[in-house]
A protein has these predicted regions:
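Catalytic cores of TIM-barrel enzymes
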Residues: 1-371
Length: 371
């Protein structure tokens, strides 16, 4: 008898070997590509959670049903990313992919002292209001937008469960370190880390616990069990392993342990090269982290390091989904499946499925496990 998506997901988290390939879950991370595959314009996809749900229905009728689905629609992803954005139908053509624009929000490192004086919540609220287009002029506007975000998330997560799928996470957070990297901009932040990391460390240590507790409260209020951690600037692509060990890891480890104590699995979205950092995750409670790899990290080495400690997902390349053939996708998936049958593995795309992915290639990922 075929397993349900939730049964497959829980089997993966257990780290126990799979008895057969039907027990292994599959997750093609899709946001904008639901529109391109389902025939919905990107401008409509970004403007409406209902249109995004419609595009999911259309797409799974073509490619089949994955076990896991992203729970945040594109319009809300743009909002919660906390970067200025170019949006289809506004700055971009109607069917273009949305774009994030990274530029320094502050140019004087003394701003770190201002954050310490204001508090992280007040400062970040001010920042998010300023980057809207047009900028928000009062906190009520931001509160209304967060309320809309919550309503959309509830609607989307309810839909995902109604279809027998599992949402990738029930709520999400961006660690303060990574948010600071984006608001300061990568190059300037790297200089700050080398010249005077003290204020950055002070901000992280002082305010991260309260930020985590707020996220825990939101997720637990809705009976959630998973938190998405978008730790996108803590990899070896952006900082040295030494800086990771000295600055990032103590705070990140404490965060993950905090979520674990609250009964939440940490879904670590690990873009870029995490290979030098993965050994640290063996220090954590077994099975408390699920690591999503995008292809920049050697997945076989990652699996060898984390096997028996934490689960991983990956990593069919975006280029293969766009330009390859179903047979090439099937062969790549077969290699991953053979590796992952020892347990703790989810077959998935390497980060997001691209806008120009071929339907038959995305379908081949599901067929590799279910056909």
């Amino acid at each position: 008898m075929a397993k349900s998506s939730m049964e497959r997901y829980m089997k993966m988290l257990s780290l126990e070997p799979f008895a057969d390939r039907d027990e292994m879950p599959v997750f093609q991370m899709m946001l904008a590509s639901f529109g391109s595959l389902g025939g919905v314009l990107q401008t409509d996809l970004c403007a409406s959670a209902d249109k995004w749900i419609e595009s999911i229905v259309r797409t799974i009728s073509i490619i089949g049903k994955p076990d896991v689905c992203m729970p945040v629609c594109p319009g809300d992803t743009i909002f919660i990313m906390q970067l200025p954005a170019r949006i289809p139908g506004r700055e971009l053509p109607d069917d273009s992919l949305y774009q994030f624009v990274e530029k320094p929000y502050f140019t004087d490192p003394s701003e770190y002292q201002r954050i310490l004086q204001m508090g992280w919540e007040a400062w970040s609220m001010q920042y998010v209001m300023s980057i809207q287009n047009p900028p928000y002029t009062n906190p009520g506007q931001l509160g209304a937008r967060f309320a809309e975000f919550g309503a959309n998330a509830g609607k989307t997560i309810g839909f995902i469960y109604s279809q027998g799928m599992v949402p990738d996470f029930d709520g999400a957070c961006a660690p303060i370190f990574d948010t600071l990297s984006m608001t300061r901009s990568m190059a300037d932040f790297a200089v700050d880390l080398m010249l005077d990391p003290g204020p950055i460390v002070d901000i992280m240590r002082r305010f991260q616990p309260a930020a985590d507790e707020a996220t825990i409260g939101q997720i637990k209020a809705n009976n959630g069990t998973r938190v998405g951690g978008f730790v996108m600037r803590s990899s070896a692509t952006f900082i040295s392993p030494t800086l990771f060990e000295e600055i990032v890891w103590p705070v990140l480890k404490a965060s993950i342990e905090r979520f674990h104590a609250a009964g939440l699995t940490y879904i670590l979205h690990a873009d870029a090269n995490w290979l030098p950092m993965l050994k640290y995750f063996t220090e954590l409670p077994r099975g408390c982290v699920h690591v999503e790899l995008d292809g920049s990290t050697d997945i076989e080495q990652a699996y060898d390091i984390l096997r028996g400690y934490q689960s991983i997902r990956g990593d069919v390349p975006a280029t293969m989904l766009a330009y390859g053939t179903p047979d090439e996708v099937a062969d790549y998936c077969e290699k991953l499946i053979r590796m992952g049958m020892k347990g703790g593995f989810m077959l998935g795309s390497g980060c997001e499925v691209p806008l120009n992915a071929k339907a038959e290639n995305v379908k081949a990922m599901i067929d590799a496990l279910r056909a």
